[in-house]
Amino acid sequence: MFFGEFEYKLDEKGRFPLPPGIRPSMKDGLILAPGTGEKCIYAYPLCEWKKLSESLKSTTVAPSKMRRLNRALFALAFDVNLDAQGRLTLPAPLKSYAGVNIEVIVAGVNNYIEIWDKETWESEKKASQEQAWQIIETLEGN
């Protein structure tokens, strides 16, 4: 399980270290994919990506919608590894998609992490916090 918010700066080669607590889960590799409907990058441990892939295969959604979802997730995904220092290099297409410049936020989101440009994250975090309690109340049936 991933949680927490971590701030980093990209080095001159576009790399940043993943938080030490996250690295062991990513030792076998990770998949980077564009956030669906959000200007961020999703980072899944390989085992979680496989689970997602399998769950999508068994989903009963209209074929045309499923093709679109598969294109959005899989066609633009990258299989990457951390370097010996635990750093991650963001592929240029995903970096551009998420608008990542120098400062990045790594946010733990249960079974995956999200990578955001710092400025974009601040806006999203505020919006998420404002809606979180409303969502919890809905889940609790209040």
Swiss-Prot record:
Primary location recorded for the protein, binned into one broad class: cytoplasm
Alphabetic keyword roster: Cytoplasm, DNA-binding, Repeat, Transcription, Transcription regulation
InterPro entries the UniProt entry points to: MraZ, MraZ_C, MraZ_dom, MraZ_N, MraZ_sf, SpoVT-AbrB_dom, SpoVT-AbrB_sf
Pfam families on file: MraZ
Keyword Kinase: no
Entry's Gene Ontology molecular function annotations: DNA-binding transcription factor activity; transcription cis-regulatory region binding
Domain SpoVT-AbrB: 5-48, 77-120
Compartment list: Cytoplasm, Nucleoid
GO biological process: negative regulation of DNA-templated transcription initiation
CDD domains recorded: MraZ_C, MraZ_N
GO cellular component: cytoplasm; nucleoid
Family statement drawn from the similarity comment of this UniProt entry: Belongs to the MraZ family.
PANTHER family: TRANSCRIPTIONAL REGULATOR MRAZ (PTHR34701:SF1)
NCBIfam families hit by this protein: division/cell wall cluster transcriptional repressor MraZ
Subunit structure: Forms oligomers.
Protein name: Transcriptional regulator MraZ
Organism name: Dehalococcoides mccartyi (strain ATCC BAA-2266 / KCTC 15142 / 195) (Dehalococcoides ethenogenes (strain 195))
Origin organism lineage: Bacteria, Bacillati, Chloroflexota, Dehalococcoidia, Dehalococcoidales
